[in-house]
């Protein structure tokens, strides 16, 4: 994976206020507990920026998360990566009690 990153790349996980080097980011992902799978749901590319939305889930089916990732490339490699993670689950009770929204069709 290191070949995809610039030597001075910076990765930020905003939801947990963490900043990593590329090496630390790769290590954090490789050593993350459990067996994980992922599905890329959306990709948008404009100039040197790529935005992805993905679902990441445990191999046994639970838990499940979604991540929005913002990549800035330099010379074809990742120079900056900003990720925003969210837990998948039902809408909160207060919103359900108001009768707002409906489930997104699969």
Say what each PLM segment does.
Residues 1-106:
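C-terminal and inter-domain tail/linker signature
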């Amino acid at each position: 994976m290191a070949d995809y990153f610039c030597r001075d790349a910076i990765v930020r996980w905003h939801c947990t206020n963490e900043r990593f080097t590329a090496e630390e980011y790769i290590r954090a992902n490789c050593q993350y507990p459990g067996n994980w799978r992922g599905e890329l749901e959306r990709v948008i590319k404009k100039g040197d920026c790529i935005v992805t939305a993905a679902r990441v889930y445990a191999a046994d089916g639970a838990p499940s998360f979604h991540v929005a990732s913002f990549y800035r490339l330099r010379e074809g490699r990742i120079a900056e990566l900003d990720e925003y993670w969210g837990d998948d689950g039902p809408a909160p009770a207060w919103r359900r009690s108001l009768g707002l929204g409906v489930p997104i069709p699969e």
